[in-house]
Amino acid sequence: MLEVQIYKKLAEFDLDISFQIEDNILGLMGASGSGKSMTLKCIAGIETPDKGRIVLNGRVLFDSEKKINVPIQKRNVGYMFQSYALFPNMSVYENISVGLKARKVKDVDIVVKKVMKQFQISELAQRYPKQLSGGQRQRVALARLMAYEPDVLLLDEPFSALDEDLKEDLLQELKNELQISKPVIFVSHNKEEVNYLCDLKYKIKEGKII
């Protein structure tokens, strides 16, 4: 379960968000600059709320009163950026394995091959991001996240840069891949995407759920 209760003063408005989810896919909708991505960044530890509390599976990640603020690398949160953030000079295999090596995970090769098989990208192991289609890049990015065995997945507008035809195909792929027993937050300004993927839906306007 993910429990979020945060407040952060921003230049345009005050971010004041509270919600909790279990093994659901939560869709956060709203216009650009409404506070959706900032909410994800606070959960991930990229940004720090002014006050509040974030609890993941009973583990306190942030508590302003108790002065708890767990570092990004220790939160076990999977964050997928709009651009997928793949390393252009690394192969698919290297993109997935590099973070595991940094975390000193045992049996890196076994873990990498397992997630590549799971996301049907084994044949792409030695290719580079520029040699991949949009759908393949998305699968690699998800495989890299899942290799870390995160406790929650945060997906920040993963379709924003794609054309409509490709987006339709990838929505179906993503829906299949997200049948997992953990909380997922999907951020989008597209109502159709959220309705298709998500069990729960919240709309954010000027930093508040409406």
State what each model feature region is.
Residues 61-78, 102, 109:
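ABC ATPase NBD coupling module
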